[in-house]
């Protein structure tokens, strides 16, 4: 396992004056000139290994030059327990203070990134291993309170071995103290970004370190609650390769983004831009039609084939073309990151939005990797997490529906597929922000509806929406899949049928030959429909949005609304 970089000790190849000018990369073992290393952000120029970075260099690398204004520098820790191990705690503190030039293991202040204001609290691993004592927690809490008072985002840079044992339960209580301050920011809709650097363990991971609305980590950063040595010595368990690394945690659904150090400032700037967005100008056109066109009626089996064309734009394609500053966020914070669901934030005409959608792909390898757009429970958990995100910040929600259905495997059932879908539907139904759902390809049963409980539901011209796949319907009702075309016709799955039924509120027409023929034109039409829909819905307050959505779905199956039923 890699060790922190250190200066060379009596290397015979170097003159004495050079001993403090070079260091050896703990990963690839190459010699690196210290000035070059610092210019490269303490990242090895040969292997890209991210070495530990001093807290002052960290602040300098992230914030606009000259913008940092420190607070809390005069607050110093107290030896409340009179603790002594091999040395008195007071001696350890004094030594750490001399070496670091700071009173504590955290540097707090205000500043800007690309002009956007924020509050930052950065832990200093060089000060007693970044351990959290009473004053450390107090300063982190003060940073959170400052962010709340100013209603500016809080960025927490974490590097810590955990709680400071020399302060006993006073240290332990900082987990609760800092967590409740972060919770207040969540309640107030103030953005919190947590950045995990190497290493981040113990009480920091189990409190503010993993409570960010967005959790970012540097490549290779070791992050966990119990460290590897504790696990091995306590329960004698061998650990898998890559365990507790940033990449491992991203795949496990706990981290949104693994970002190389030289890209971190740009990623933060994008997040801040999205969260500082305002209202959009009125849409110039509606972008969709609300009346069926008899001439547009097509054979249902033809629509079925078109909806499944792997050349059609995917959710990722729409995110890249429609939303400015789109940032994909990963993970459900419970069990994993399902690639069959793409989620993130961006802006639409200057208005911040949250986006969630099924994701298939265009090539065989991606289709397999995305499970053909069939989500596992983790995918629906991720979607629900992003619905919470939308409501927390008052952002409209846009969902793209394109799935043959939820994954039907044993593993999905064991992890509660039905519950995951039900909770997703329930959460979307209760949102007090505008929600617009668009069926862009396949709308397969409950797995589709989980992302389809919008205030406004649109469908693309060549998409379909159905209670079951026509093949499944044919097999169950006729005992053979040979009557799929008949089943498709009788299920009334086409855009025109759905509009007559009132299941959708509008149809977005596709370019000649279908959406797969011109991604840019399709994205432009869909962007117009989304801007118009969100603009209209944004005129309603939260309670009115909730009531409108409830009434929209209440009418289905109500005999008093028989006028919306399809005519034979």
Swiss-Prot record:
Binds 1 zinc ion per subunit. It holds the Pfam family Zn_ribbon_ACC. The keyword Ligase does not apply. One of its GO terms (molecular function) is ATP binding. Residues 21-536 are annotated as: Carboxyltransferase. Zn(2+) binds at residues 25, 28, 44, 47. It comes from the Bacteria. It is found in: Cytoplasm. This is Acetyl-coenzyme A carboxylase carboxyl transferase subunits beta/alpha. It comes from Saccharopolyspora erythraea (strain ATCC 11635 / DSM 40517 / JCM 4748 / NBRC 13426 / NCIMB 8594 / NRRL 2338). The lineage of its organism: Bacteria, Bacillati, Actinomycetota, Actinomycetes, Pseudonocardiales.
